[in-house]
Design a protein with these regions (language model features):
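C-terminal functional module detector
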Residues: 1-243
Length: 243
């Protein structure tokens, strides 16, 4: 019954805890509920406990992100850059995208690297110099990322990312937490460069958001959580119609 009524959430495998409810006036609703109301507002209550530090929490209305919560702040100096390869050619067989990637700084130094969704021990990144690193990976609709911990990279210094799917050239002062994305065709094949703090520590977040309801327009509210290690979780939507 709970499954048929959408009172559940899904994860990519990690046992992420999510407790999400919608409060309209004094009544509480579970994820997946179909709600008709005369109220003008809904309060969305979200609690998340991750199995790894949290990178972001996205609040959706249908396909649209209405807010992104990042439980961390960036330092004044760039310390860590994440380069993400993602997407697929199309649904079904043959969707696999092969990536051949090189990342290079024109100033500063790459001190160390980390990986997300690199499961093949024979396909790990390799340094070619203290300013350049090379790797190969594949995606089939999901994402694969390499984190670079950098030193002395700032201002107009430039990061070059060259791949067989698309290339990027971006100044250090243009790399922020939201990221810069290069679309590469297919079904959401993309290359993204973003900045992260040196270390993420926050695994638990509790927030509440008051959202407006508009007469005759259905809101389809759900929450997506993304951890630093790439694992994600999604709730079923609330379907809320003011009438």
């Amino acid at each position: 019954a709970a499954f048929r009524n959408r009172h559940h959430y899904a994860t990519t495998g990690a046992r992420i805890f999510m407790d999400v409810n919608a409060q309209i006036d004094k009544e509480m609703h579970q994820i997946g509920d179909i709600i008709q109301t005369t109220s003008d507002n809904v309060t969305l209550n979200v609690e998340v406990i991750g199995t790894a530090p949290l990178e972001r929490i996205d609040l959706f209305d249908g396909k649209n992100i209405i807010e992104t919560i990042r439980p961390w702040n960036l330092p004044r100096q760039i310390e860590r850059v994440r380069i993400t390869c993602a997407g697929q050619h199309y649904r079904g067989r043959g969707r696999l995208v092969k990536w051949d990637v090189g990342a290079r700084l024109d100033a500063g130094q790459i001190k160390q690297y980390g990986t997300v969704n690199f499961w093949n021990p024979n396909k790990q990144p390799k340094f070619s110099s203290e300013t350049e690193i090379l790797w190969e990976t594949v995606t089939t609709g999901g994402a694969s990322a390499v984190d670079l911990w950098v030193d002395g990279f700032s201002g107009a210094d430039t990061l070059f990312v060259d791949t067989n799917q698309g290339n990027m050239k971006i100044a250090a002062n243009k790399i922020d937490e939201t990221g810069v994305t290069q679309e590469c065709g297919g079904m959401d094949i993309r290359l993204t460069v973003q900045q992260l703090p040196r270390q993420l520590t926050q695994k638990q977040v509790a927030i509440s958001r008051d959202l407006k309801l508009i007469n005759g327009i259905e809101r389809r509210l759900f929450v997506r959580v993304t951890q630093e290690d790439g694992h994600q979780a999604w709730t079923s939507p609330f379907y809320i119609l003011q009438s």
